[in-house]
From Swiss-Prot:
Keyword Nucleotide-binding: no
Function: May be a transcription factor with important functions in eye and nasal development.
Biased composition (Low complexity): 81-94
Protein name: Paired box protein Pax-6
Taxonomic lineage: Eukaryota, Metazoa, Chordata, Craniata, Vertebrata
Pfam families per record: Homeodomain
Oligomer and partners: Interacts with MAF.
Matching CDD domains: homeodomain
Amino acid sequence: QMRLQLKRKLQRNRTSFTQEQIEALEKEFERTHYPDVFARERLAAKIDLPEARIQVWFSNRRAKWRREEKLRNQRRQASNTPSHIPISSSFSTSVYQPIPQPTTPGSMLGRTDTALTNTYSALPPMPSFTMANNLPMQPPVPSQTSSYSCMLPTSPSVNGRSYDTYTPPHMQTHMNSQPMGTSGTTSTGLISPGVSVPVQVPGSEPDMSQYWPRLQ
């Protein structure tokens, strides 16, 4: 309790200022930061305050002004710092390497064209595919001719039905110049995909009765 009482005695009562007093003090502070004793006494009589309180207010106001001025200087330096940072030559050389410029305007294009030409020349030439090379037109041999003709009976009439021998258009000239086949010539007739039966094509009157049971 004694301690609290002593502390209260040492503490000074805070002075409360009215709006008119603060305005008069601020106006005097704008005129001078260090008013003399005569100015303080005249102001004290004007705003009804002790001269000691006015002196303390000016002291606190100057301290506040110095803090604000310090902050303003720091902000001003921070805003001006990026434009005034010196860049050393070693830093700029190590980070930003100079870009080599071509000696002549067309040198870069010339090098590019040469590289493209070398690339395309290194590719193997594409083989030319023509119908004449891949599909040679050879005259049909008698065995091929007979294989086409054996797909249907060569007899004019079998079991009362007549059949005509199928001849491809491009083989008609060879069919007219070459005989259908000689006696004893044997070829393979294609009945269905993957099935083949030997068929004898005689040159004279054929006997088809022995072949029809196989086909049926």
